[in-house]
């Protein structure tokens, strides 16, 4: 198949725009269009390539992204101090700040490494690991924001899915185990 946007040959799509529109019924067409190619690339790259795997992955993406409405954590904007740290008692600070299970060991990590991407990559440790996989710095400056851009938002979801071996749970049609791991 020739991709008309890039004029390059690529594999047949694993999911069509019409299928996405059925699942993401409330999604704007511009968001379907924006995520369509990166989504098919991630499905192929991360071997999310059987009907059960695709169904489970797409269902999780639909839930976590609000049907492509959100590619970043949607809690209300926190009040930040002069160092960019969520103020004590804010929802960001209470939920993520100092969460060593997520690798949030520096002041401000809770807000800085909040969920981004279509399944909400969260925590310094996940940003570091995903960045190492890409051979790209995702932790300095404004670089964490890159994970909210369409290509990385989808790829981060595929990477997270793959590194948690979620295909094996999808193959068993085990939605509860998948959901717990996401």
Locate predicted features.
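N-terminal carbohydrate-binding/catalytic regions of secreted carbohydrate-active enzymes
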Residues: 22-55, 182
């Amino acid at each position: 198949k020739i991709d008309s946007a890039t004029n390059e040959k690529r594999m047949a799509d694993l999911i069509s725009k019409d299928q996405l529109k059925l699942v993401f019924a409330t999604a704007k067409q511009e968001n379907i269009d924006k995520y369509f190619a990166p989504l098919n690339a991630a499905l192929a790259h991360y071997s999310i390539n059987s009907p059960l795997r695709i169904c489970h992955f797409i269902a999780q993406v639909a839930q976590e992204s609000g049907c492509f409405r959100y590619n970043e954590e949607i809690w209300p904007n926190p009040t930040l101090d002069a160092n960019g740290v969520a103020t004590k008692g804010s929802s960001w600070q209470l939920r993520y700040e100092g969460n060593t299970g997520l690798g949030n060991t520096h002041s401000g990590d809770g807000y800085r490494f909040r969920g981004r991407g279509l399944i909400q990559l969260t925590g310094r440790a996940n940003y570091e690991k995903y960045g190492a996989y890409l051979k790209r710095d995702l932790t300095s400056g404004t670089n964490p924001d890159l994970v909210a851009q369409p290509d990385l938002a989808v790829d981060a979801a595929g990477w997270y899915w793959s590194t948690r071996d979620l295909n094996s749970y999808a193959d068993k049609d085990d939605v509860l185990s998948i959901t717990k791991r996401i």
